[in-house]
Amino acid sequence: MSPRFHALKVREVKRETADAVSISFEVPESLRESYRFSAGQYLTLRATIDGADVRRSYSICAGEDDGELRVAVKKVEGGAFSAYANENIRAGDEIDVMTPSGRFLLPAYEGGGRMLVAIAAGSGITPVLGMIRTVLAREPESEFFLLYGNKTAQSIIFKEEIEDLKDLFPGRFGIFHVLSRETQDVEMLSGRLDADKLTPLLTHVVPAVEADGVFLCGPGEMIETAGAVLAGLGVDPARIHREFFTPADGSPAHAPKPAHADADIDHAASAELVIDGARVSVPVAAGETIVDAAIRAGVEAPFSCKGGMCCTCRAKVVTGEVDMAVNYSLEPWEVEAGFVLTCQSRPVTDKVVLDYDAM
């Protein structure tokens, strides 16, 4: 079933840092199963701001056994929704919340102990915190190490919660704060999470090559750098999992070229969309994406970031051909299987059929 919105009541809004809040929601019993999540997934929130429909995706920061549905929102410059959330949302408000999505997930647990590593920067901690809480609660023999980059100690989101986990699980949870604008006693922990910093940290402090899984989350530049360092250390690419919060400047967007390199996307077309078992046809104007065509036609197709990162708009091309401009979230196997990000896809053929229900 495709993700869908429901109005949920805000249970609590907690100030985490000067520019970040966590928001928890009340989930009625009738929707409990719909909002059951896996650690690492995200919610898409929707609100009308200055007369415009604005939606943004935020990672769930609770563990699977915590009994709560909670996200964190960091205020960003020019961010309409992040400013709205930090300044206006209060306990008792109702907000449209899409059911959980995302495949930035923990590998299946097969028993015994495993060693996991996460590298996060800024608000990239949010899905990672949920993973850490889940593993520590469910896997008594497993270890989790976190390298967490921030500007200053005051800007660390969930600082107290992370320290509490360290005290609760000594020997199983290791946290290393790396600060770019504050000098720390350990020189290795002062500065940016760049290649010069990550290489010794992942060699001598956290033996990444021995990890059963490595999770990267935050700005694209950090993720690309960390991925390159891990590859250089010989970490199996299949064990590296990425969640982009912003694309890296100049980084490759992993989108395939259309089968016909000279394919014309600047022509009108027709798109048939399969959503929750129903079929609806929408006209697509020249140069228009599938998502924009659906919005213009008043069709409630899943989408959020419209930047090729969150994967909410994922669908499978059943008939015809599209050109996907950028892709920061689909795995290679998904692209091979015909899945696309409809916020980045424009019809190449006169008619296309896309299935949002395909798994």
Short names for language-model regions:
Residues 1-94, 98, 111-114, 142, ...:
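Ferredoxin-reductase
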Residues 1-11, 15, 19-21, 29-31, ...:
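Iron-sulfur (Fe-S) cluster-binding modules
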Residues 42, 68, 93-94, 289, ...:
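Residue-level marker of beta-strand positions
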Residues 64-67, 109-114, 139, 347-356:
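Ligand-binding loop in jelly-roll beta-barrel domains
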Residues 83-263, 267-272:
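FNR/FR-type flavoprotein reductase catalytic core
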Residues 266-309:
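C-terminal accessory/binding modules appended to enzymatic or scaffolding proteins
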Residues 280, 293-297, 302, 312-359:
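Iron-sulfur (Fe-S) cluster-binding segments and ferredoxin-like electron-carrier domains
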